[in-house]
Amino acid sequence: MDKVRRFFANTLHLGGSSDAKEEVKVEKVIPDLSFDGFAEHWRVHGFRKIVTMVGAGISTSAGIPDFRSPGSGLYSNLKKYELPHPTAIFDLDYFEKNPAPFFALAKELYPGSFIPTPAHYFIRLLNDKGLLQRHYTQNIDTLDRLTGLPEDKIIEAHGSFHTNHCIKCRKEYDMDWMKAEIFADRLPKCQKCQGVVKPDIVFFGENLPKRFYSSPEEDFQDCDLLIIMGTSLEVQPFASLVWRPGPRCIRLLINRDAVGQASCVLFMDPNTRSLLFDKPNNTRDVAFLGDCDAGVMALAKALGWDQELQQLITSERKKLSGSQNSEELQQGKEKPQSDPDKMTSGDRDKKDASL
């Protein structure tokens, strides 16, 4: 009974004497769990097996909105699609009845219109150094792939635009085919059965990819650092990844907001469940609360990697810029001259502005 009393008094802060609090000794994985202390530990001692898990927050500086930010988030800006509720745009039942709003949004967010951020390239740098075990992402924007990160290192928990399937016969279509259909403002229809072709994005009511369930056991077995960036940790089962590493694995949060601090009442072992970076019983959690790009740049500087990271960003973006320019030129050759009688008012405004 004393053990139970001490647990609730010290871990859950639900009462108990000050003497009981003193009885619990917190053994930290590293002596200093501040961001600077963590960075110094990494610089001196290093890590061997790093897992990253990210959300929309690492892509916002690329111009892609996150989902839940009031006013600027994706769900706050869907009124023009006249949806029954904001999340309907990713609802499978609604999509089957009315796919047009999703494809209108897809045109705005389609991969190829954006370039990876410093946070994306930091993950690529981890892989280049042989430190990255696996990269788990909630994002559907494929920016991870654009950095040159190997496909086998990436688990797109919520799918992506990279592959596409007919929702009726399951015939597969590649990304280039889907892009051509979307940007021609055509509803993507299967050439075999005329069913609607949907990107392999996980909608509400669909299962996550098999690799999401089969990989964590191996990935987290000897993981000594979990880096969490740009995610609200509100969507399950993705958020449950923070529970997977053992108690000696350090968990680093780089995020605008403090997240992952679920009520300990829900979990009998809060040291493996909630992030405790601001709690007195914290043993292994570290936080950088701010912009994701600023966080990785600060970390790279502390590790002496800042020049290397900047060189990687510059060289890879130059490659992407050349590739995109080439694609635009090719599209320009194939695109007929605009018919003034068929131009929208927006097209005319753009043309007038260029004169």
Curated annotation (Swiss-Prot):
GO biological process: determination of adult lifespan; positive regulation of oxidative phosphorylation; rDNA heterochromatin formation; response to starvation
InterPro entries cross-referenced by the UniProt entry: DHS-like_NAD/FAD-binding_dom (IPR029035), NAD-dep_sirtuin_deacylases (IPR050134), Sirtuin (IPR003000), Sirtuin_cat_small_dom_sf (IPR026591), Sirtuin_class_I (IPR017328), Ssirtuin_cat_dom (IPR026590)
Gene3D superfamilies for this protein: SIR2/SIRT2 'Small Domain, TPP-binding domain
Limits of the Deacetylase sirtuin-type domain: 28-306
Chain positions recorded as Zn(2+) binding sites: C166, C169, C190, C193
Biased composition (Basic and acidic residues): 330-355
Lineage top rank: taxon: Eukaryota
Binding locations of NAD(+): 55-75, 138-141, 230-232, 255-257, 292
Region of interest: Disordered: 316-355
Reactions catalysed, as given in the entry: N(6)-acetyl-L-lysyl-[protein] + NAD(+) + H2O = 2''-O-acetyl-ADP-D-ribose + nicotinamide + L-lysyl-[protein]
SUPFAM superfamilies according to UniProt: DHS-like NAD/FAD-binding domain
Gene disruption: observed consequences: Causes lethality during development. Induced silencing shortens life span.
A Pfam family: SIR2
Record's keyword terms, sorted: Metal-binding, NAD, Transferase, Zinc
GO cellular component: cytoplasm; mitochondrion; nucleus
Active site, per annotation: H158
Coiled coil regions in record: none
Enzyme class: transferase
Keyword Transferase carried by entry: yes
Cofactor note: Binds 1 zinc ion per subunit.
EC id: 2.3.1.286
Function statement: NAD-dependent protein deacetylase. May be involved in the regulation of life span.
Family assignment from sequence similarity: Belongs to the sirtuin family. Class I subfamily.
The protein, known as: NAD-dependent protein deacetylase Sirt2
Species of provenance: Drosophila melanogaster (Fruit fly)
